[in-house]
Amino acid sequence: MVVGTLRVRLLLRESRSLKDKRQVVRGIKDRMRDTFGVSAAEVDSLEDHKVAVLGFAVVSNEHSHARSVLEQVGSALKSHPVAEFLGMELDSLTVD
């Protein structure tokens, strides 16, 4: 079993409060879950209303499949209309 993880850092220029941030983050997480079948959570910068750090995970039987799915998530976020893409870290591990 392979677990792929993706950590994405986004800048939310239009966010004026944590409430604004939560609304944007919720929409991003829901869309990525629905489109790519990944698990999603906000994992860092929880109190900063301008920055969102999101974690995504996928379980697969092949490293290449897990990596492909997460790269598609990253690509989708790079073109998000509200959030500016700041960077990502992609990793995978084998679990016996």
What are these regions (language model features)?
Residues 36-43, 84-90:
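Short beta-strand elements
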Residues 1-39, 76:
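N-terminal first-folded block
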Residues 3, 41-62, 94-95:
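Short, charge-patterned binding micro-sites
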Residues 60-96:
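C-terminal structural segments of small proteins and small subunits
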Residues 6-10, 54-56, 88-92:
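A structural signal for short, well-ordered beta-strand segments
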